[in-house]
Structure formats: structure tokens, C-alpha cells
Amino acid sequence: MTDMRRLGQRAKQASLLIAPLSTQIKNRFLSTLAKVLVDDTQTLLAANQKDLANAKEHGISDIMMDRLRLTSERIKAIAQGVQQVADLADPIGQVIKGYTNLNGLKILQKRVPLGVIAMIFESRPNVSVDAFSLAFKTNNAIILRGGKDALYSNKALVKLIRQSLEESGITPDAVQLVEDPSHAVAEELMQATDYVDVLIPRGGARLIQTVKEKAKVPVIETGVGNVHIYVDAQADLDMATKIVINAKTKRPSVCNAAEGLVIHEAVAARFIPMLEKAINQVQPVEWRADDKALPLFEQAVPAKAEDFETEFLDYIMSVKVVSSLEEAISWINQHTSHHSEAIITRDIKAAETFQDLVDAAAVYVNASTRFTDGFVFGLGAEIGISTQKMHARGPMGLEALTSTKFYINGDGHIRE
């Protein structure tokens, strides 16, 4: 028997053991875990330093190092996310609807756990805790397979969670970490149909594509953020400048950072110089501009076709000038990864049209795309941001990790 099969068997057994846990027990444990995370900050930072040292040795960029880095403040934020999950209403057992049918059968539809969730993710060690807290609150067992660059951090975090579970009298196999970073083991997890009820990949385009091609278990696609901001003809250009600077430069390595800028031709000649001057005072950006935008920049390079399809995760941004709202919507729908999109405008009708017709999980008016986040949306820590339409869409909180079951009670009913 392979190690992966053993992990799968233990996860399946754990899912049965934690299925009956009450809301009170789950919340008490999560509150304890939030405190333990803060108390053990130095242990976690020491493990993270090993990952950072390895990353530096392998020449990983500063921006990607930021995804990997834990700090005392970030650990506090992770703990706050866990506590927020504890404070949220428990969806398990929630009655969605109840009725008596024509035969006199009493029928209830309730929310129930999915069972065993597998998570394959890259770089960001906070995902280990975020994913576990949501899975545990919804009575699911979880198998975590992080990237090799965060192995020490993930091992320390999962060890801490497992110890806390055991001390609370709960099976530690409610969470397990796949420590083997090989692609072969990852593929085995993708195909573990006997044990895994759903697989959630969270990472770059290559990871998502690999999972789509090789997984045999059900998959919820998340993550890739080719995110656009459209500056409309009726935009407040001061507002647009602040929003673009925030969405591009605040944390360029995250999936809700803006990657593409679409500008109406009526304001392009005023807005581009204004934006370029302002952003250079904060953080210079490499502009990859189309033929109409290029001469309006002091410094830019001609965009290639692939630039409009790329999630840069860096201080780089593609720029497209359009002649109408309709062209902007068409362009964005052609290139979007269906994550988050935004329009800056004072035209209410244009805003409504944009929100109705742009095909993305989150569509903003006059706000930065950086808000697409489970914590910000009040969902607690998120397990990912779904870019598909089936089962879940957008930041995935507790309800996204549940299924439904029909409970039918009769009194000797038979069907004639």
C-alpha cells in the first residue's frame, strides 16, 4: 500500500469520526487553535526562515518571497481568521427547506459535510490553516499538499494543528500533510477516487491546468487572476488613479491584484500621463501597451498578444485602449480568468451594464479588486476563490464546503 493510500484511508476514517462533532466542540477547538498559533509564533517563524533561506538560494524573486513569508503580524492575521471562522454560524445541519409531500412524507433538505477534501496549493503557508479551519468547521477531513518551497512552514503549522487536535480529544487525522513534493504523489492524490470527495487546487495557471488534465476526483477550479480595471469615459480620474495604484502595487503577487488596464479613448490622453506620474512616486510599473496607448506613456513597451493573457504577479501591467463600453466588456470577457473585474465610472447605467455582462466571480464598481477575499467578504478564512460556475463561485467560505442531503420520514409509506 502506498503512503498516499494510507493517508486517504486515514482521512476517510477521520471524516466519519468528526462528522458528529457539535458546533460547540468545533468552535471551542478553533478558538484554542487561534490562541496557540499566536503563542507559538516564534516556532512558526523559525520554520518559515528555513523556507525563505531555501527560496533565496534558488533565486526566487522578492515578490514571490513575499507570498512565502510569515511575520508576527501575518500569524496574528491567520489566527484572527481562525477565530472569525469559529464566530461564524455553523452551516452543518442547517435546514434549507422542509415540507410534507402529497404522499404524506416529511422531507427535509439539510446541509452536510462533503467528507474528505484534498487541497493542492503553492507557496503561501497561511493556506494550510485557512483550509483546515474551514474544513473542520464544516466537519470535513482535509489532506493538504503544499508546494516544496513552503514545506518547513507547512510541516510546522500542520504539526501544531495535529497536536492541538490530539490534546482536545479529536482525531489528529482530521488534517494530514503530504510531505512528498513529487509530481507522482500529487497525481496519485488527484486520482484518489476511493477517498477524496473533492479536490481544490490553489495556485498558478500551470498547476490549475495540470489538475484539470489529470484529476479523476471532482475538482473546484480556483485561483488564476488575470484581473482587469476598466477606466470608463465618465470616470473620476483621481479615483481611477488611486484604485489602479492600489490594485497593482499593494501586493502584486496575489490573485486579486490587477494585471490589465483597459481605458476608454475619450480619457486615455489625460489619464495615462496622470497615472504614470502618480504610480512612479509609489512603485514604478512596466507598462505593456497596445498601439493606441503606447505613445501616451513616457516609458512603455509594445504589448505582445500573450501579455493580455498573463497573470504577471509582478509590477507589470498590460494596457488596452477601447472606443466604447461594449468593446471594453468584449475585450475583458475574451481575456478574463473569471476572477475579479472592475469599472471606474460615474455613469450608473454603464456600471450596471458592466456588472451584468462581465463574466467574473466578483465585479466591482469604483473599488479596487484587492477586496476579493473571504476574510473581507465576511466569510472567515477562505479555502480559495472559485473561478468556475458549478457548486461554488468566488471566495469559498463555509457553505462552499458543504453538500446537501434529503432526510425523509414516513410511517409505513409504500409506493404503489
From Swiss-Prot:
Catalytic activity: L-glutamate 5-semialdehyde + phosphate + NADP(+) = L-glutamyl 5-phosphate + NADPH + H(+)
Gene Ontology terms: biological process: L-proline biosynthetic process
Listed EC numbers: 1.2.1.41
Enzyme class: oxidoreductase
One GO cellular component term: cytoplasm
InterPro entries in the record: Ald_DH/histidinol_DH, Ald_DH_C, Ald_DH_N, Aldehyde_DH_dom, G-glutamylP_reductase_CS, Glu-5-SA_DH, GPR_dom
Pathways involved: Amino-acid biosynthesis; L-proline biosynthesis; L-glutamate 5-semialdehyde from L-glutamate: step 2/2
Span of the signal peptide: none
UniProt-annotated location(s): Cytoplasm
Gene Ontology MF terms in the entry: glutamate-5-semialdehyde dehydrogenase activity; NADP binding
Domain of life: Bacteria
Record's keyword annotation contains S-adenosyl-L-methionine: no
Keywords of this entry: Amino-acid biosynthesis, Cytoplasm, NADP, Oxidoreductase, Proline biosynthesis
UniProt cross-references to SUPFAM superfamilies, sorted A to Z: ALDH-like (SSF53720)
Pfam families linked: Aldedh
The family this protein is said to belong to: Belongs to the gamma-glutamyl phosphate reductase family.
Function of the molecule: Catalyzes the NADPH-dependent reduction of L-glutamate 5-phosphate into L-glutamate 5-semialdehyde and phosphate. The product spontaneously undergoes cyclization to form 1-pyrroline-5-carboxylate.
NCBIfam families: PRK00197.1, proA
Identification of the protein by name: Gamma-glutamyl phosphate reductase
Gene that specifies this protein: proA
